[in-house]
Amino acid sequence: MLEKQNRKECIFSLVSALIVVLCTSTGIVMNLTTLYDENFDHMGIQTFCMFTVLSNLLVAVGMGLVIPYTIDGLRKHYFHLPNWLITFLLAGSTSVTLTFLVSLFILSPFKGFVLIFTGSRFFLHAICPILSFIAFSFFISDHYINYSECLLALLPVFIYVSLYYLMVVLIGEEKGGWNDFYGLATYVPAWIPVVLNLPVTFGITCLLRYFHNRSFLRLREATVRDEYSEDYLKSEIIYLARQNAADDQPHSDIVIPRRFIKFLIENTDSDKTVRDACIMYLNQFLDNTKY
C-alpha cells in the first residue's frame, strides 16, 4: 500500500512540476513578446518588475528542482525530497497563492475578471498558483514543516514589498522609480498595504503548512500501521531480492540475508517461518536476475 501511495505522490508531483514549469515559461514568454498592452504597462523586459512574474518564476524553479527527484523516485521506487527544497517550495507556493488571491479579490473587481484571468495571466494568475497549492499541500508531503520554516517562506514577499515601497513611494516614477502599477499607494494610504501584507502572507503560509503537515501525518500513520504487517514483510523481502538481483554478476554467489529476514519476522506480526521467507527471497532473486 505504501509503495503505491509513494508512487502516486511521485507521479502527481512530476506531472504538476512539468505543468507549472511549462505554464510559467509560456506566460513569461507571452509577456516578453508583447511590447504593448493598453491594459497593462509592464510588458517586455519590464514584466520582471511584477510580483506575479517573480512569484511564478520562484515556484517554477522549485518545481523544476523537483523533477530529478521524481524521476529518481520512479526508478528506485522511493520518492523523497530534501528539507531545503520543501522550504523553498513553501516560499514559492506562498508567493503564488498570494498572487492568486490578490488577482481574484483585488485586481478583478477593478479591472474585470476576464481581463485578469485571460492571456498570459491565465497561466500566471490561475493555473500555476492553483496547481502549486494542490501539489504542495497534498502530494509533496514527506517533511513536517515547523513555524521557523514558515517565517523563512515570508522572505520573498518581504523583499518585494520593501522594493515596491522604495521604488514607488520613496523614489517615485518621476525620479526613475516605478509607477504604482498595482495601485496599492493610489487608492489607499501607502502604509496600509505594507502593514497588512506580511500578516496576510503569514496566514497563507500557515494554511499551506496545515494541509501539508496533515498529509504528512496521515502518511506517517499509514506507515506505522503497515510497518508491522504481513504485507510489509513481503514487500521488504521482494524489494531486497529485486535490488540484489539487479546487482548480480555471472560468477557471484547467491547470498540469502537470513539474519535480516529473521529480524523482519521477529518485528512483524507475520506467522511465516524463516525458512519460508528465505525461499520467497530466493524465488524472487532467481526470477529477477539476468544470469
Predicted regions and their residues:
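N-terminal membrane topogenic signal
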Residues: 2-19
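Alpha-helical transmembrane segments of multi-pass membrane proteins
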Residues: 21-35
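Juxtamembrane "helix-exit" motif on the non-cytosolic side of transmembrane helices
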Residues: 31-40, 104-113, 170
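Non-cytosolic membrane-interface motifs at loop->transmembrane helix junctions
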Residues: 42-50, 112-123, 148-149
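Alpha-helical transmembrane segments in multipass membrane proteins, preferentially the mid-helix core
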Residues: 129-146
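Membrane-interface transmembrane-helix boundary segments in multi-pass integral membrane proteins
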Residues: 169-211
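Short, highly charged, low-complexity non-transmembrane loops/tails of multi-pass membrane proteins
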Residues: 216-235
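Charged, low-complexity interaction regions
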Residues: 245-255, 268-275
